């Protein structure tokens, strides 16, 4: 007799076996070009091997496609699309439930900073240590186990169930090979017929909002000069600091807390702040002619990223037009030095460089059937529903929402270990996770 979907439980041995194989590949899954370009097929082969007995080609029910979006340049970086077909497939009103976003690449791990081997699954009680346990190979193993159970039990579902494991999530320097390319090519179009759960978050509660991110370099231009003669130049270190302070002042006026942030319970409003200095080649007794502060902007999804960039560029244009109105640092600190006998004129200026494409934040639709089912399932299994919103960024998710997908977000690793040394996840969380996901499917089937 077929077991009800809502009764599925994690096959612990099978899950840990697959996860161990995936973590064992992570040294070659690290993503930081150009030095570290992942070979996601090294992980994908273990997923395919686990699912092979259940594929239609072998007498099973699952359909699987490995998609290399740029096979010429990246022949070993394949996305994996898995489908458990529902009874509505091929009808005029197909229904789908999709689990997307669990990725096959990982962030780099420094062995010397870890207490354990990051490239090996190490089990200590409930804790599963290794790079990718939380982000995001644990989710890959979890969903693979879910599909094996579907293929074994063969429930008659109206909805087709999809999983999409993606490449190149942890770094966007090589575009056009991951979920963005799958979307643009139409490979994900069937997933528009129902909720899409982005399974790459943490702490087992729904994430209902994320922030957008834009990195920047702010550079002040002056002129190199001996530090004994500050009156003859524009000190770029002073200028870049004062300019940034003025830009931040204006930013927080224009991008103040949005009323919807309270509804979504964002833990932080939009921010603009410095995070790095570019190294300055010089000495203690040289005033540098150029200084650069680096940082990022985090924008809640209720503001537009393009409008934000235009605003900031406007601040800088105004600052340059009125450079002498910035606060100076004493009687010999000036941002416009006029010509005089023996002194060449120097006028300071600032410029901003936007690094890469901005990732926009997303506000999930709280009135959708997809969210309601996930919320109810989470509450039933964990005993409470406490959705979160964060200014952390999930690349590409907003693009999918803008393409017409009903995006919902969840995940079952540990937030505190994301991208961290000694990353771990809890086996007990994954045991609950399969119950949450299978109950979500069950609720949508009954809707």
Swiss-Prot record:
Its cofactor is Zn(2+); Co(2+). It is an enzyme of class 3 (hydrolase). The keyword Lipoprotein does not apply. The active site is at residues 105, 169. Zn(2+) 2 binds at residues 135, 170, 419. Zn(2+) 1 binds at residues 103, 135. Binds 2 Zn(2+) or Co(2+) ions per subunit. One of its GO terms (molecular function) is metal ion binding. It catalyses: N(2)-acetyl-L-ornithine + H2O = L-ornithine + acetate. GO terms for cellular component: extracellular matrix; phagocytic vesicle. It comes from the Eukaryota. One of its GO terms (biological process) is ornithine biosynthetic process. Pathway: Amino-acid biosynthesis; L-arginine biosynthesis; L-ornithine from N(2)-acetyl-L-ornithine (linear): step 1/1. Keywords: Amino-acid biosynthesis, Arginine biosynthesis, Cobalt, Hydrolase, Metal-binding, Zinc. Gene3D superfamilies: 3.30.70.360, Zn peptidases (3.40.630.10). Its EC number is 3.5.1.16. PANTHER family: ACETYLORNITHINE DEACETYLASE. Belongs to the peptidase M20A family. ArgE subfamily. Homodimer. This is Acetylornithine deacetylase.
């Amino acid at each position: 007799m077929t077991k009800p979907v809502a009764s599925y439980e994690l096959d612990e041995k099978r899950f840990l076996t697959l996860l161990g194989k995936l973590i064992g590949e992570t040294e070659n899954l690290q993503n930081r070009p150009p030095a570290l370009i992942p070979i996601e097929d090294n992980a994908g082969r273990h997923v395919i091997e686990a699912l092979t007995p259940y594929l239609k080609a072998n007498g099973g029910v699952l359909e699987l496609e490995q998609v290399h979006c740029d096979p010429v340049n990246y022949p070993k970086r394949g996305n994996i699309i898995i489908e458990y077909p529902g009874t509505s497939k091929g009808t005029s009103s197909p229904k789908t439930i999709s689990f997307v976003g669990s990725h096959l690449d990982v962030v780099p791990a420094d062995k010397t900073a870890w207490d354990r081997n990051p490239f090996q699954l190490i089990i200590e009680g409930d804790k599963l240590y290794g790079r990718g346990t939380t982000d995001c190979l644990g989710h890959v193993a979890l969903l693979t186990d879910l599909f094996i159970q579907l293929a074994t039990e063969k429930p008659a579902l109206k909805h087709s169930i999809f999983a999409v494991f993606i490449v190149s999530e942890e770094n966007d320097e090589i575009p056009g090979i991951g979920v963005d390319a799958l979307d643009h090519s139409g490979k994900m179009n069937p997933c528009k017929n129902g909720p899409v759960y982005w399974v790459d978050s943490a702490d087992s509660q729904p994430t209902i909002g994320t922030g957008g991110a834009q990195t920047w370099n702010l550079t002040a231009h002056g002129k190199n000069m001996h530090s004994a003669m500050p009156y003859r130049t524009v000190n770029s270190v002073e200028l870049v600091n004062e300019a940034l302070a003025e830009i931040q002042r204006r930013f927080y006026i224009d991008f103040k807390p949005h009323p919807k942030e309270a509804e979504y319970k964002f833990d932080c409003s939009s921010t603009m702040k410095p995070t790095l200095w570019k190294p300055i080649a010089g000495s203690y007794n040289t005033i540098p002619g150029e200084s650069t502060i680096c940082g990022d902007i985090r924008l809640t999804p209720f503001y537009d990223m393009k409008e934000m960039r235009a605003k900031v560029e406007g601040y800088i244009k105004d600052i340059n037009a009125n450079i002498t109105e910035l606060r100076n640092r004493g009687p010999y600190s000036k941002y416009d030095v006029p010509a005089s006998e023996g002194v060449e004129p120097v006028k300071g200026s600032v410029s901003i460089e936007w690094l890469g494409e901005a990732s926009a934040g997303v506000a999930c639709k709280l009135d959708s059937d997809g969210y309601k089912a996930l919320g109810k399932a989470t509450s039933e299994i964990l005993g409470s529903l406490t959705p979160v919103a964060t200014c952390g960024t999930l690349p590409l998710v907003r693009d999918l929402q803008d393409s017409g997908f009903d995006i919902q977000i969840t995940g079952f690793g540990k937030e505190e270990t994301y991208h961290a040394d000694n990353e771990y996840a809890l086996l007990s969380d994954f045991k609950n996770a399969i119950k949450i996901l299978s109950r979500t499917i069950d609720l949508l089937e009954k809707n």
